[in-house]
From Swiss-Prot:
Recorded family membership: Belongs to the sigma-54 factor family.
Gene: rpoN
One Pfam family recorded for the sequence: Sigma54_DBD
Composition-biased stretches (Basic and acidic residues): 50-79
Placement of sequence motif RPON box: 454-462
Record lineage: Bacteria, Pseudomonadati, Pseudomonadota, Gammaproteobacteria, Enterobacterales
GO biological process: DNA-templated transcription initiation; nitrogen fixation
Function field: Sigma factors are initiation factors that promote the attachment of RNA polymerase to specific initiation sites and are then released. This sigma factor is responsible for the expression of the nitrogen fixation genes. The open complex (sigma-54 and core RNA polymerase) serves as the receptor for receipt of the melting signal from the remotely bound activator protein NifA for the expression of the nitrogen fixation proteins.
GO cellular component, one term: DNA-directed RNA polymerase complex
InterPro entries reported for this sequence: RNA_pol_sigma_54, RNA_pol_sigma_54_core-bd, RNA_pol_sigma_54_DNA-bd, RpoN_core-bd_sf
Record protein name field: RNA polymerase sigma-54 factor
Gene Ontology molecular function, alphabetical: DNA binding; DNA-binding transcription activator activity; nucleotidyltransferase activity; sigma factor activity
Length: 477
């Protein structure tokens, strides 16, 4: 065995804690980033928050002071740009610049209001407390409400409710009586045993002289399965109703709510703060970061200056360490926002037809298209478009919304799957309710427009729009 020494020259990019921080900030949503920055403000005395007015007035003075102070404290230079554009799969899985351009007025910015929510059970219990129940009936009512799911239906039988109460003196009839009272709470039809029970309870609240009410009750009571299958021919035969009468009765039934519990807001609301604002100015689409969505950070110059003057080595080291962390955080934030703005502007430029004319004009676009245009890695584009939202005259969209697969057209071109989905929705909206378009017919109509897609693909697009198949869309006209 021969031993020896070899010299090998290689280049390797070190994953520093600062670079890890920059990449992590890139992935955070606005709400998550707000929390992150607030924690930094709370823990680092060298960081402070400033508003836009103060930032504009003091920027030049700060820059001069910062250069003198920081150079004296720390000779190590920071890079001009953080190398965020890399595939760092091993890192994490899940004042800042706002760009120059349009000056948004306060009354032009979108307002995003929070909302309070309560569960269906809380809402029902509030009504129980306002209802003159006896103590026994109130206990029964509580057990019934506990058995109601979010759609408004009982999850267990009345017999099981009787058993769960655990009182031998409470019988089935008493529970049924309380149940009937709760079913007339708001929303009417809640705590129903099944769909038939739910619809009949709602129908019972109509005035007796309501037109077609008896015919509607007959259909719900005895022929709900035929109605569910839109088998109107069989319905006319078994009910012996004329077509016009059947149509009116069905319309009355369709005015009822099959899931009354869902009319009550449940769960936590989802808050969305747009990161990017888009508007048209002088025939040009202008893209700006939402400067109001994040706090602006700066170095506290008074504390920074103490790093040289303090005689306590421990205090001096504490100040220098926090100063360096503050500088890196501000730099990381600037890199994040610069990347977000570049990518957003590129997306808007590529999808101008969408902003001008709507979904049907969405262009097919994948991550690689934007990555190539801005000269970044696809993984960077994926991070910066996840949980980042754009506000435009057409609404609020996650940046990922603008990416879609392509479908070949007859002329050798490509169409976006998003555009095809919008076209399917448009065709169905214009169909004859008595003869709704089947998936095969939709496929043919798309083919006539030069879009070549399989029937199963059309079915997938229709289902993604929550549109039922043609046999369930059929209506009497």
């Amino acid at each position: 065995m021969k031993q020896g020494l070899q010299l090998r020259l290689s280049q390797q990019l070190a994953m520093t804690p600062q670079l890890q921080q920059a990449i992590r900030l890139l992935q955070l949503s606005t709400l998550e980033l707000q929390q992150e920055l607030q924690q930094a403000l709370d823990s680092n005395p060298l960081l402070e928050q400033t508003d836009l007015h103060d930032e504009v007035e003091t920027k030049e003075a700060e820059d001069r002071e910062s250069l003198d102070t920081v150079d004296a404290l720390e000779q190590k230079e920071m890079p001009e740009e953080l190398p965020l554009d890399a595939s760092w799969d091993e890192i994490y899985t899940a004042g800042t610049p706002s760009g120059n351009g349009v000056d948004y007025q306060d009354d032009e910015l979108p307002v995003y209001q929070g909302e309070t929510t309560q569960s269906l059970q809380d809402y029902l219990m509030w009504q129980v407390e306002l209802t003159p129940f006896t103590d026994t009936d109130r206990a029964i009512a509580t057990s019934i409400v506990d058995a109601v799911d979010d759609t408004g239906y009982l999850t267990i039988s009345v017999e099981d409710i009787v058993e769960s109460i655990g009182d031998d003196e409470i019988g089935l009839e008493e529970v049924e009586a309380v149940l009937k009272r709760i079913q007339r709470f708001d929303p009417v039809g809640v705590a129903a045993k099944d769909l038939r029970d739910c619809l009949l309870v709602q129908l019972s609240q109509f005035a007796k002289e309501t037109p077609w009410i008896e015919e509607a009750r007959l259909i719900i009571s005895d022929h709900l399965d035929l109605l569910a299958n839109h088998d109107f021919r069989s319905l006319m035969r078994v009910t012996r109703l004329k077509e016009e009468v059947l149509k009116e009765a069905v319309n009355l039934i369709q005015s009822l709510d099959p899931r009354p519990g869902q009319s009550i807001q449940t769960g936590e609301p989802e808050y969305v703060i747009p990161d990017v604002l888009v508007r048209k100015v002088n025939d040009r689409w202008v893209v700006e970061l939402n400067s109001d969505s994040l706090p602006r950070l700066k170095i506290n110059q008074q504390y920074a200056a103490m790093g040289n003057s303090t005689r306590n080595d421990a205090d001096g080291q504490f100040i220098r360490s926090n100063l360096q962390e503050a500088r890196w955080l501000i730099k990381s934030l600037e890199s994040r926002n610069d990347t977000l703005l570049r990518v957003s502007r590129c997306i808007v430029e590529q999808q101008q037809a969408f902003f001008e004319q709507g979904e049907e004009f969405m262009k097919p676009m994948v991550l690689a298209d934007i990555a190539q245009a801005v000269e970044m890695h696809e993984s960077t584009i994926s991070r910066v478009t996840t949980q980042k939202y754009l506000h435009s005259p057409r609404g609020i969209f996650e940046l990922k919304y603008f990416f879609s697969s392509h479908v070949n057209t007859e002329g050798g071109g490509e169409a976006s799957s998003t555009a095809i989905r919008a076209l399917v929705k448009k065709l169905i909206a214009a169909e004859n309710p008595a003869k709704p378009l089947s998936d095969s017919k939709l496929t043919t109509m798309l083919s006539d427009q030069g879009i070549m897609v399989a029937r199963r693909t059309v079915a997938k697009y229709r289902e993604s729009l929550s549109i039922p198949p043609s046999n369930q869309r059929k209506q009497l006209v």
